[in-house]
Amino acid sequence: MKPITITDDNFEQEVLKSNLPVLVDFWAVWCGPCKMIAPIVEQLAAEYDGKLKVGKLDVDNNQQSAIKYGVRSIPTLLIFKDGKVVDTIIGAVPKPMIVNKIEPLLKTA
């Protein structure tokens, strides 16, 4: 499974109303570190299919969501559960760091 495209228009439905925890990658086309983390985000979408929803939000085209959640630098990964932000990861970080943040959420799902 590939990451879904999150927009200002579908944010509430795809993220806030999701029955699964959601990892949202706030990114932009021109962002070098975003390109570095993109393959990791794709791997997580495949590996956690059915347990975690993974989405990507282009901040240039969806500024409303980025502003609402205080995203000031990219890449920023926000992890939502039950409609609330439960964790934040800023920057291109190694995959194990992201996994360590999402695994505990899956055990309580």
Task: Describe the residue ranges of each PLM region.
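Conserved Rossmann-like nucleotide-binding pocket used by diverse enzymes
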Residues: K2, T7, W27, K53-G55
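Conserved helix-turn-beta segment immediately C-terminal to the redox Cys motif
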Residues: N19-P21, A38-L57
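Non-catalytic, surface beta->alpha helical segment in thiol-disulfide oxidoreductase systems
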Residues: I79-A109
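A short beta-strand-turn-helix
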Residues: P3-V22, Q63
